[in-house]
Amino acid sequence: MANKTDFQVVDISMKITNQLPKVIITDELMVTVNNRKNNILNIQAMAQEFEKKKEDEMAFMTKGLEMLVGASATAKIEEMDLPLPEYKMLYETIMGVAIGTYGEEQTPSR
C-alpha cells in the first residue's frame, strides 16, 4: 500500500497556456479554433444526433466548423468554394487541432 511519501509533485503549469490555437487557411484567412472542452463535447453530442438521424455529412461538417471557428470564418471558408477533398482536409485539420491530434502520425488500423 502506498503512503504519502511515495507520491511526488507533478507540475503541469507550463503546459497549460489557456490560449486558443490558430489555423492559417490562406494569406487572408486565419481562424481561431475554439477547442474548449464544452465546445468539443457539444460537437460530439451533435455527431451522435446526426448519426442517429442519418443527416447529411456536409451539413454536419459545416455546423462543426461554425462551432469551432465561428459563423463569420465558416462563411468565408464556404465562399472559397473548395473542391471536396480540400474542404474535408481543412475540416479534418481544424478538428485535429481542436482535439489535440493534429500532427500525430495516422496509421491505418489492421
Indicate where each model-derived feature is located:
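Generic detector of solvent-exposed, compositionally biased contiguous segments
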Residues: L29, N34, E66-V69, P83
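Acidic, aromatic-enriched beta-alpha/helix-loop junctions
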Residues: N38-A71
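Residues that form generic nucleotide/phosphate-binding pockets
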Residues: K15, M46, G64-L68, K76, ...
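Charged, low-complexity surface segments at secondary-structure and domain boundaries
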Residues: T26-M30, A45-E51, A73-E79
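Short, charged/polar N-terminal "headpieces" of proteins
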Residues: M1-A45, S109-R110
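C-terminal charged interaction modules
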Residues: A2-F7, A75-R110
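Polar/charged alpha-helical tracts
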Residues: D11-M14, A45-Q48, A59, A75, ...
